Every structure is written in C-alpha cells, then in structure tokens.
C-alpha cells in the first residue's frame, strides 16, 4: 500500500523554527485529526502535496500543542524553504512510497553491483530529498565494502550532472585540491593569487568546515564575501582570472554535500567516495588541469605512502576517463602548516605570506610556492622547470598580494566579525627537549572546542613545530576563545605535542 491508496488529509502549514540540517522534517500534533495511528508513526516517511507540488519528509509527532496546533502541520526550516508555500496553506499528507531506487541499494547490500542507471536514479532521488538520512546511510554503507571502477565512473558522472555545470572560454582552467585533515594548510589562498597574477585562470570553489576548525571558505570569509552566485562568480573570474568562493552557494555537486552530511557522523571516508566527491565538483567546475595534494602523516587521513599511491592511481584513472589532466603530489602531513588554526588566525597567516612579512610562517610560504609551481607548469608558454622561480617572483614582487586585493575587492567586503578571541590560555612544555611529534587530530579537536569555526576568532596560535627546542614552561601554543567555557575546556585537553630529550633521534618520527 502506498500514499495514493489512502485518503489525503489537509492540515495547514505552520513554520517551525527547527534546524534539521538537510533533512525535510514535518511535525504533527498527537491530537490532530489528520494523525491516524494505523497510518502514521513517528519517523515514518510522508508525502506532502499542494497542487502539483510534492515533497517527501520525515514525520515527528509531538504532545506539545504550543509547537503545532491540532489543525496544523509544522515544517522545519529546511522543509519550509523547499516547499515554498505560505503559512496557512492547506496541504495534503499521506504515507510516502519508498523511492524505487532503494531496490538497487538493497541489491548492492546483498552483493550485486550498481548499473549506471541505478546510480543515476539514486543521485536524482538524493538531490530531490526523497531519501531520509537512514536511507542515505544505507546507500553509503552498501558502497563502502566494494565499488567497481564502472560504478565509480557512473557515480562521478551522476554527481557532477546533478548541479550547476560551469563552462569557460579559456582552454586551460587550473585548479587544486587538498584532501584535508591538516590544521592550517591554507595554501589555496596563496596559490590562487599567484597563479592568477601569472595569467592562468583558476576559479577556486571551496568548502566550509565540517569536522575541522576552518575550511578555505571560512578563512576567505575573513577577507571577503564568499557566498556569490554563478553569474557573479563568472564576472569575478573574468575581471581577476581567479576567485575564492564557497562552492555550496554555486551548487556544484549538491549530492556530495548531502552525502557528506551523513558520512561524517558515521565515520565513513572510503577512497572511492573521496575521489567521487572531489572529482565530481571539479568536473562540474569545468577544470581541465587539476593538482591534488595528499598529505601523509601519522595523524593525517593517509598514514603512509602506500595509501597515498593507491589513492593517486584512483584519481588518475578517473581524471583520464574525463579528460582532466590530474597531477597528484604527496606532501608532509606530520604537523600543521602555518601557525594559525581557525578562520581569523589562518587568514592572518595568509596575508602575512602574501605581504612577505618576515614573521610569516615559512612552511606555509614554501608549500604554497611549490604547489603554485606545479600549476604554472601547465602554461605552455612557460619554460619547463621554471614554475617555482616564476611563483617566487610573483610572490616576492608583490604581484600576488596585488592580485589577492583585486579578488577581495571584486568579491566584496566580509560580512561577519573578524575579531580575534580575547580570552587566551598558553599551553606550555612539560619538560626540556625537542618537539618530536604533533597530533593533528588532537589540535583540530581542541580548536573546535575553543569555538572554531562558529566563533571565527577562536582557535590556536602555534609557537613550536617539530624539531624545535623547548624548555619546561615555554609556550607551545596559545588558545583563543570568546567564551570562558570553550577556553577552559580546550586548555584542559591533551597537549597534542610529544617532547623527547635532546638525545632522541627526531628522524624516528614518520
């Protein structure tokens, strides 16, 4: 039996101030005449219909009539925005039939493979919010144990086609992406102005933080607007040859954003899903030449070179299929890159490097130059092997800073608070010796406890890196926060630093 076999009851729409993430949720009173116990149960899927408009949602039943009255149907904020009908409108509600594409998910769980048609239908249902979070989880888990190359190609294709697809006039569109996991590491904000100042086109779309203290979009937002639309983005790129904007507002690969929202709580991060996530967005963005940064370290996403090699081959395979020139570089992921962790602190690092400040973090400068060099080598007019020298020339001369300011002016001024957290606590060394290890995962966690990225000025300022000599009581890093509770909780956490005696051999650190 499905929703078309039952009478459709018509409560009136009420807007409920509930943030339910990406999931459509509707709330009904237990005392509502529309609530038929033999038909509706809590957390069941229902179909809402008004005229020709249809939306699927998860049903919540409440005993609190102050939230929704007996004649009302409350729509959570995401559901209200998507349904886009005025408060007080009569709406029919009925049990929802399961999406037909779930049959393919069940078959995959039992060991079969997806066809390209299966994956296309699944992604279509995902992007039209026909799947609940539980059904999305089922799809992710069904794909986690194994995925064929054919399934991966079909997944990338379907995800790229589901959103905006950008087209550019230039024959060479360069881009870069890091798989993440390393605190700081805000190289894109230095690479983009260097490459754009040279003359190549680099329309960079970036993500916001999900489990980290800052994403590139969060950090760029300290300097300029990042929530620009497609047409405005094209205008900025036409004027500046580059941009640094939030990909979510441009709507590249919307299925990926939905999948990530369920992946992260489950701790799922398979190689295939990572490749599909990244390359679907780059394919939709119109990239022709792509540089992938794979940090390797004991607390990075990739812990050894073998893992990096397997992932590299997967990126190259999919890139070749779609005609994207993919270059993969393996980088040092043993410790943070730069001194700041958190949006404001990371933005300060970026601008210090671009301004050639003598106090700027040398590791962030050097890594950015090396990555920019790889991208500049894609210019057929540039002599082979001269990419690094050209990148350094553009940075040292101030051309990159000038280009960054041009991009900032084109995107517009920031719209959020850019103050640094004024409550601080210094974490100090417990003994004399040398820093032999830094736990990236732990530092990310401490920065989030301090308030980042919600509080833009919260985070951590590092004073010591691997190989540095320290004395007992000397500050290793400083916690910044706006709330006393965040500062104190972060200060009470594990130090994240390993300190060995002078006699220890630092080469033992992977």
UniProtKB/Swiss-Prot annotation:
Lineage: superkingdom: Bacteria
Catalytic activity, EC: 2.4.2.4
Catalytic activity: thymidine + phosphate = 2-deoxy-alpha-D-ribose 1-phosphate + thymine
Keyword Cell division: no
Keyword presence, Transferase: yes
Residues of the signal peptide: none
SUPFAM superfamilies recorded: Nucleoside phosphorylase/phosphoribosyltransferase catalytic domain, Nucleoside phosphorylase/phosphoribosyltransferase N-terminal domain, Pyrimidine nucleoside phosphorylase C-terminal domain
InterPro entries: Glycosyl_Trfase_fam3, Glycosyl_Trfase_fam3_N_dom, Glycosyl_Trfase_fam3_N_dom_sf, Nuc_phospho_transferase, PYNP-like_C_sf, PYNP_C, Pyrmidine_PPase_CS, Thym_Pase_Put
Catalytic EC class: transferase
Keywords, in A-Z order: Glycosyltransferase, Transferase
Molecular function terms, GO-annotated: 1,4-alpha-oligoglucan phosphorylase activity; thymidine phosphorylase activity
Cellular component annotations (GO), alphabetically ordered: cytosol
Swiss-Prot/TrEMBL GO biological process terms: pyrimidine nucleobase metabolic process; pyrimidine nucleoside metabolic process
HAMAP family xrefs: Thymid_phosp_2
Family named by the database record: Belongs to the thymidine/pyrimidine-nucleoside phosphorylase family. Type 2 subfamily.
Name of the protein in its database record: Putative thymidine phosphorylase
Organism: Nitrobacter hamburgensis (strain DSM 10229 / NCIMB 13809 / X14)
Lineage of producing organism: Bacteria, Pseudomonadati, Pseudomonadota, Alphaproteobacteria, Hyphomicrobiales
């Amino acid at each position: 039996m499905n929703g078309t076999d039952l009478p459709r009851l018509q409560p009136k729409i009420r807007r409920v101030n509930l943030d339910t993430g990406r999931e459509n949720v509707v709330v009904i009173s237990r005392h509502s005449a529309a609530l038929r116990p033999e038909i509706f149960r809590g957390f069941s899927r229902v179909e809402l219909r008004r005229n020709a408009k249809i939306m699927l949602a998860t049903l919540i039943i409440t005993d609190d009539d102050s939230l929704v009255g007996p004649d009302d149907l409350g729509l959570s904020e995401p559901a209200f925005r998507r349904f886009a009908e005025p408060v007080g409108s009569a709406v029919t509600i009925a049990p929802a039939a399961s999406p037909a594409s779930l049959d393919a998910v069940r078959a995959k769980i039992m060991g079969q493979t997806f066809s390209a048609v299966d994956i296309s239908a699944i992604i279509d249902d995902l992007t039209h919010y026909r799947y609940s979070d539980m059904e999305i989880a089922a799809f992710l888990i069904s794909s986690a144990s194994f995925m064929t190359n054919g399934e991966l190609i079909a997944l990338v294709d379907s995800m790229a086609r589901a959103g905006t697809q950008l087209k550019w006039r230039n024959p060479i569109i360069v881009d870069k992406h890091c798989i993440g996991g390393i605190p700081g590491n805000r190289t894109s904000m230095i690479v983009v102005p260097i490459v754009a100042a040279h003359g190549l086109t680099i329309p960079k779309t970036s993500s916001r933080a999900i489990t980290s203290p800052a994403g590139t979009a969060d950090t760029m937002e300290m300097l300029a607007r990042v929530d620009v639309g497609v047409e405005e983005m094209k205008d900025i790129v036409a004027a500046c040859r580059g941009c640094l904007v939030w990909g979510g507002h441009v709507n590249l690969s919307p299925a990926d954003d939905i999948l990530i929202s369920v992946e992260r709580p489950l701790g799922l991060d398979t190689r295939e899903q990572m490749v599909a996530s990244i390359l679907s967005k780059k394919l939709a963005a119109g990239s022709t030449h792509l540089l992938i940064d794979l940090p390797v370290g004991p607390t990075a996403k990739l812990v050894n070179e073998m893992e990096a090699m397997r992932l590299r081959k997967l990126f190259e395979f999919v890139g070749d299929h779609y005609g994207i020139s993919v270059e993969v570089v393996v980088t040092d992921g043993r410790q943070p890159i730069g001194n700041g962790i958190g949006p404001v602190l990371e933005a300060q690092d970026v601008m210090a490097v671009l301004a050639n400040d003598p106090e700027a973090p040398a590791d962030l400068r050097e890594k950015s130059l090396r990555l920019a060099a790889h991208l500049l080598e894609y210019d057929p007019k540039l002599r082979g092997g001269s990419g690094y020298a050209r990148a350094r020339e553009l940075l040292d001369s101030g051309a990159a800073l000038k280009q960054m300011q041009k991009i900032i002016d084109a995107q517009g001024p920031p719209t959020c608070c850019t103050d640094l957290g004024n409550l601080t606590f210094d974490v100090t060394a417990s003994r004399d010796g040398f820093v032999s290890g830094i736990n990236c995962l732990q530092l990310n966690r401490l920065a989030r406890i301090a308030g980042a990225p919600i509080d833009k000025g919260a985070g951590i300022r590092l004073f010591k890196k691997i190989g540095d000599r320290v004395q007992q009581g000397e500050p290793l890093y400083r916690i910044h926060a706006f709330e006393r509770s965040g500062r104190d909780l972060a200060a009470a956490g594990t130090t994240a630093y390993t300190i060995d005696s002078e006699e220890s051999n630092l080469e033992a650190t992977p």
